[in-house]
Amino acid sequence: MVVRAFVLLALFAEASAKSCTPNKADVILVFCYPKTIITKIPECPYGWEVHQLALGGLCYNGVHEGGYYQFVIPDLSPKNKSYCGTQSEYKPPIYHFYSHIVSNDSTVIVKNQPVNYSFSCTYHSTYLVNQAAFDQRVATVHVKNGSMGTFESQLSLNFYTNAKFSTKKEAPFVLETSEIGSDLFAGVEAKGLSVRFKVVLNSCWATPSADFMYPLQWQLINKGCPTDETVLVHENGKDHRATFQFNAFRFQNIPKLSKVWLHCETFICDSEKLSCPVNCDKRKRMLRDQTGGVLVVELSLRSRAFSGLCDFSDVLLHLILMLGTWAVL
């Protein structure tokens, strides 16, 4: 009789345990920093708790962070490039880092749909083994969401040689003092998207540090429009690439710092549902309502896991795009 009571008590305790409310949106946020990769997914994806999700299928190191489960790859240096199963590939001068977050429940039965979010960051780099450091330019973000299907988006922030935006200029590059004030040409380009999706620059700014939140900033583009007459936006929201130019400059009175980092917050606009081109004389309400740095992609695709066409009209793929590149001035 005592044994039965114990079993009933255990069952009651299990049933009364509070579980999280399943979040069925395929969402992943990826921050590609020079030496660190941070990935976030909304809490409770398809009912999974943070302790049931593993980075690289190995490390249960996720933490709760403001409504998200956050996973960090803290060190991309050569001595630790396989952190928690992180895979890397080096094809000079490009370095790719790959990882994934998967559900891994060791219980007898699994009641939640498995999830598998894979992602990678691509760096244009000179990988200095002796210094364990990158030539610090974050160039491209690749993300795949794998819980209901697969999708890959690639975006890159590039410099160009002139206003035709046809020839890329490799960063970092050095400007002589006499070139301060000359025109620099930059753009964000998307690959792997259908023609209906357009690239929209929400904001671009420069810092003397790789940290995009560095307190000293010089704003170039705000809500899709130039902040002053020295900045010219060529295309924004019209094509798979958004382009602009600005005058070269350097930050004053900063000891031992001669690098200027350019950061852009970008999102993808569905031209079949929204008016994407940015009109700077009469700014669209859409731009005011967007949260900066978030790429929003609505998609329909065929998944190998299903026989028919899967409609993801209610699935948003969110990517935080903090592309940074620097010039030595």
UniProtKB/Swiss-Prot annotation:
Keyword presence, Cell membrane: yes
Residues annotated as glycosylated: 80, 104, 116, 145
Residue positions of covalent lipid attachment, annotated as GPI-anchor amidated alanine: 305
Domain ZP positions: 19-283
Bilayer disposition of the protein: Lipid-anchor; GPI-anchor
Gene3D superfamilies to which the protein is assigned, alphabetical: Zona pellucida, ZP-C domain
GO terms (BP aspect): sensory perception of sound
Disulfides per UniProt: 204-264
Any one of the GO CC terms: plasma membrane
Annotated propeptide span(s): 306-329
Signal peptide per UniProt: 1-17
InterPro entries (UniProt xref): ZP-C (IPR055355), ZP-C_dom (IPR042235), ZP_chr (IPR048290), ZP_dom (IPR001507), ZP_dom_CS (IPR017977)
PTM comment, free text: The presence of a hydrophobic C-terminus preceded by a potential cleavage site strongly suggests that tectorins are synthesized as glycosylphosphatidylinositol-linked, membrane-bound precursors. Tectorins are targeted to the apical surface of the inner ear epithelia by the lipid and proteolytically released into the extracellular compartment.
Intracellular or extracellular location(s): Cell membrane; Secreted, Extracellular space, Extracellular matrix
Pfam family, one: Zona_pellucida
Any one GO molecular-function label of the UniProt entry: extracellular matrix structural constituent
Domain of life, source organism: Eukaryota
Keyword annotations from UniProtKB, A to Z: Cell membrane, Disulfide bond, Extracellular matrix, Glycoprotein, GPI-anchor, Lipoprotein, Membrane, Secreted, Signal
Cited function: One of the major non-collagenous components of the tectorial membrane. The tectorial membrane is an extracellular matrix of the inner ear that covers the neuroepithelium of the cochlea and contacts the stereocilia bundles of specialized sensory hair cells. Sound induces movement of these hair cells relative to the tectorial membrane, deflects the stereocilia and leads to fluctuations in hair-cell membrane potential, transducing sound into electrical signals.
Quaternary structure (record): May form homomeric filament after self-association or heteromeric filament after association with alpha-tectorin. Interacts with CEACAM16.
Comment field on protein domains: Zona pellucida domain may enable to form filaments.
Protein name: Beta-tectorin
Species whose genome carries this gene: Mus musculus
Organism taxonomic ancestry: Eukaryota, Metazoa, Chordata, Craniata, Vertebrata
